[in-house]
Curated annotation (Swiss-Prot):
Organism: Alcanivorax borkumensis (strain ATCC 700651 / DSM 11573 / NCIMB 13689 / SK2)
Alphabetically ordered keywords of this record: Ribonucleoprotein, Ribosomal protein, RNA-binding, rRNA-binding
Gene: rplI
Cited Gene3D superfamilies: Ribosomal protein L9, C-terminal domain, Ribosomal protein L9, N-terminal domain
A Pfam family assignment: Ribosomal_L9_N
Protein name as annotated: Large ribosomal subunit protein bL9
HAMAP family attached to this UniProt entry: Ribosomal_bL9
Family: Belongs to the bacterial ribosomal protein bL9 family.
Biological process (GO), any one: translation
Keyword flag Ribosomal protein: yes
């Protein structure tokens, strides 16, 4: 399935690009979320007419993400979780827990989808470096300390 991208998507393409994607990814994710349109002649013409508006909107989103990154840069967040004697957690600390902790401690809204945990949820106490993908082009690293709850 061919789609026209309405914003820059990492590992896929830039704004206005016509790309081939799997049908399910296009129909169930990109198009409903307003990130793409089906590649028809009418839609191609419409995107060309709206290109300046779309680029302005993309620049605003990038600027907002960079502002959030500046506020979050070098941030250290602490989460208390129940843990055993050896530092192993009873349960885990996931993306939702991390996003809520960052939002409450810094005042900057962070969505759970922006928190990147390449090795899955955290299951031990200690200090970790967590990446936040605030935009396709903006990533910021924060320090997260998981401490045992009293």
């Amino acid at each position: 399935m061919q789609v026209i991208l309405l914003e820059t998507i990492k590992n896929l393409g830039d704004l206005g690009a016509v790309v081939d994607v799997r049908s399910g990814y296009g129909r169930n994710f990109l198009i409903p979320q307003g990130k793409a349109l089906p590649a028809t002649k009418a839609n191609l013409a419409e995107v060309e007419q709206r290109r300046a508006e779309l680029e302005k909107h993309a620049a605003q989103q990038l600027g907002a993400a960079q502002e959030r990154a500046e506020k979050l840069n070098e941030t250290t967040v602490s989460i208390a979780a129940k843990a055993g004697d050896e530092g192993k957690l009873f349960g885990s600390v996931g993306t939702r827990d991390i996003a809520e902790a960052i939002s409450s401690s810094t005042g900057v809204d962070v969505e759970k989808a922006e928190v990147k945990l390449p090795h899955g949820a955290l299951r031990t106490t200690g200090e970790f470096e967590i990446d936040l993908a605030l935009h396709a082009e903006v990533t910021v690293a924060i320090k997260l300390a998981v401490v045992p709850a009293e």
